[in-house]
């Protein structure tokens, strides 16, 4: 077990496949389970872990939707300090609900959905 880990669930509720972009990166650590495309109505789990003495893991996963919208999912589990998570879409019709935990072996769930789905109807 690594000193720091982030178990990342990506829950796709967009109606489209999330296409992994090449600019997905780790600023610290390594992938134990690398990100991949995520089909609609699927949940995929990826794991990033620290790789070295007194280090954490940090990175951003980038997805595109139909080559139009871009989704970014940021995570940081530092060796010292608080964990941070953030999700962002460059198109207002998609939102990211981020639920992240604390601790050295943390878990975060990013649910990517159409903005209207929170009101019980699809666009």
From Swiss-Prot:
**Keyword annotations from UniProtKB, A to Z:** Sporulation, Toxin, Virulence
**Protease among the record's keywords?**
no
State the Gene Ontology BP annotations.
sporulation resulting in formation of a cellular spore; symbiont-mediated hemolysis of host erythrocyte
Q: Which biotechnological use is given in the entry?
A: Expression of the 2 toxin genes in transgenic corn confers resistance to WCR and has been commercialized.
Give induction info.
Answer: Probably part of the cry34Ab1-cry35Ab1 operon.
InterPro entries, alphabetized: Aegerolysin-typ, Cytolysin/lectin
| Pfam families named among the record's database cross-references | Aegerolysin
In its miscellaneous comment, the UniProt entry states: Iodination or fluorescein-5-maleimide modification makes the protein non-toxic to WCR.
Q: What is this protein called?
A: Insecticidal crystal protein Cry34Ab1
Organism encoding this protein: Bacillus thuringiensis
